[in-house]
Amino acid sequence: AWLVTCP
């Protein structure tokens, strides 16, 4: 999961 933890 990086799209949810990108910012």
UniProtKB/Swiss-Prot annotation:
Modified residues (D-threonine): 5
PTM sites of type (3R,4R)-3,4-dihydroxyproline: 7
(4R)-4,5-dihydroxyleucine PTM sites in chain numbering: 3
List of residues that carry D-serine (Cys): 6
Keywords for this protein: D-amino acid, Hydroxylation, Methylation, Toxin
Protein's UniProt keywords contain Nucleotidyltransferase: no
Superkingdom in the source lineage: Eukaryota
PTM (free text): The 2'-methylsulfonyltryptophan is thought to arise from cross-linking to Cys-6, as found in other Amanita peptide toxins, followed by sulfur methylation, beta-elimination, and oxidation. The cysteine, converted to 2,3-didehydroalanine, is hydrated to D-serine.
Cited function: A toxin that binds to rabbit muscle actin with a dissociation constant of 20 nM preventing actin depolymerization, causing cellular and tissue disruption, and death.
Protein name as it appears in the record: Virotoxin
